[in-house]
Regions:
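Conserved glycine-rich, hydrophobic/aromatic-active-site segments
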Residues: 90
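Short glycine/proline- and charge-enriched loop/turn segments
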Residues: 78-87, 125-133
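A C-terminal cap/extension of S-adenosyl-L-methionine-dependent methyltransferases
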Residues: 112-173
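Conserved SAM-binding loop
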Residues: 1-78, 93-105, 161-173
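Short secondary-structure boundary/capping segments
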Residues: 7, 83, 154-155
């Protein structure tokens, strides 16, 4: 986070957040879990980050990545109004197949796909706001969120946002 955000975290919550450069200064194989909650879609150098994660994870460590899924029902419904496209802040847009490919390129494998159930409602509400849909939009957002989640019940790869549990393949160690 930027300096102002780090100061607010310290002042308001007594949390010390480090500049992103510190990621590259951590000892190798020092983390059992690295978690990114709606972060990866914002990074400028995806390859450098993936390499850093590989070097920081311990043997059998896990990388947990949560990102929006542009192949979800709500993304298909809202099309250009889908709030999780969030341009220009989202530099990347992921789907289960693109995450699988990213992992394969980095000698990693997705172990699990888990839906983020509430994201479908939040993203649908924002999408309706972008459409200036008014009160009816709030009602429609609820139903679109429900439909999106129903589809994710059958297939987690259809969720509005997905939590990926990722491990390195042995050859990467």
């Amino acid at each position: 986070p930027d300096e102002g955000s780090r100061e607010r975290a310290l002042d308001n919550y007594n949390l010390t957040l480090l500049p992103i450069d510190e990621l590259y200064n951590q000892p190798k194989h020092s983390f059992e879990v690295i978690a990114l909650w709606h972060v990866l879609e914002h990074v400028h150098d995806l390859s450098a980050y993936m390499n850093a994660f590989k070097s920081l994870l311990k043997v059998n460590g896990r990388l947990i990545i949560a990102v929006p899924n542009h192949c979800s029902y709500d993304a298909q419904f809202y099309k250009n109004y889908w709030a999780a496209y969030d341009l220009p802040r989202h530099l990347y847009h992921f789907s289960p197949s693109s995450m699988d490919k990213l992992c394969a390129l980095n000698n990693m494998k997705v172990l699990q796909y888990k839906p983020m159930w509430f994201d479908s409602f939040y993203v649908s509400l924002l999408s309706e706001k972008y459409k200036n849909a008014g009160f009816f939009g709030i009602v429609r957002a609820f139903f679109i969120g429900c439909i999106s989640n129903f589809k994710a019940l059958k297939n987690p790869k259809r969720a509005s946002s997905i939590i990926y549990e990722i491990k390195m393949l042995d050859a990467a160690l």
